[in-house]
């Protein structure tokens, strides 16, 4: 049975409303739940024969790309610069987030722990920030077709545009 917990996934799991959760940020919820004495076991989909996939991607409409290419290009460029800076100074990225969001409710301790879990992933691999591997998308789409998650007509290359990343 699938249960929609909304954004209340950690408390829902800890209260026994569900046996497992998916689609959470393992670098956040697992830390918060651990701090509350709840033991977690992070399951990585690729360990269960799900092809590797891109998790955090920038999304815009085809209309925006067509009508505002300069805006999209500048946004992607700024995003990539921020990502590269965060990868080179993870704790500094948390400092920047806190400085730019003084009124936000930010769990600084959790974010500092979480960024240390992410940092090795940011620096792994030889691909440049913002690059996409078409074969990775192809593998995921083909797997999704075998699981009846998408229709047979879906073409992976139609779902992304990496022309704004340099």
Language-model-derived ranges and their functions:
Residues 28, 60, 124-127, 145, ...:
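Residue-level signal for pocket-adjacent positions within structured domains
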Residues 8-11, 17-103:
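Pocket-lining segment of extracytoplasmic ligand-binding domains
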Residues 61, 133, 161-162:
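Residue-level signal for threonine
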Residues 137-166:
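Conserved C-terminal helix/tail region of periplasmic/extracytoplasmic solute-binding proteins
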Residues 67-147:
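Secondary-structure end/capping motifs
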Residues 16-18, 127-128:
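Short, contiguous strand/loop micro-motifs
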Residues 2-5:
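Short acidic-hydrophobic, aromatic-tinged amphipathic segments that line or gate anion-handling sites
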